[in-house]
Amino acid sequence: MAKQSMKAREVKRVKLADKFFAKRAELKTIISDVNASDEDRWDAVLKLQTLPRDSSPSRQRNRCRQTGRPHAFLRKFGLSRIKVREAAMRGEIPGLRKASW
């Protein structure tokens, strides 16, 4: 089980990313615009750097909903491999069963 503080930190990162999404997108379009002046582009770079680090979506980490485990996360289920296996063995995931060939 992950610490509660780690789970809370992830929630905070998601909220910050949502809050600053539009502003980051606007600044990135200015930076990538070849028709914009160098001064405008440089100002946009500086403004982008002043935004909180945790507002960047690349700092988010997928975590298991039940345990908070950051590794072996399966996006389809939103769970770690361990919890997916446990749920599958109990028959809680429709259509999922242990492979046999």
From Swiss-Prot:
InterPro entries: Ribosomal_uS14 (IPR001209), Ribosomal_uS14_bac/plastid (IPR023036), Ribosomal_uS14_CS (IPR018271). The keyword RNA-binding applies. It comes from the Bacteria. Keywords: Ribonucleoprotein, Ribosomal protein, RNA-binding, rRNA-binding. GO terms for molecular function: rRNA binding; structural constituent of ribosome. One of its GO terms (cellular component) is cytoplasm. Part of the 30S ribosomal subunit. Contacts proteins S3 and S10. Binds 16S rRNA, required for the assembly of 30S particles and may also be responsible for determining the conformation of the 16S rRNA at the A site. Belongs to the universal ribosomal protein uS14 family. HAMAP family: Ribosomal_uS14_1 (MF_00537). This is Small ribosomal subunit protein uS14. It comes from Sodalis glossinidius (strain morsitans).
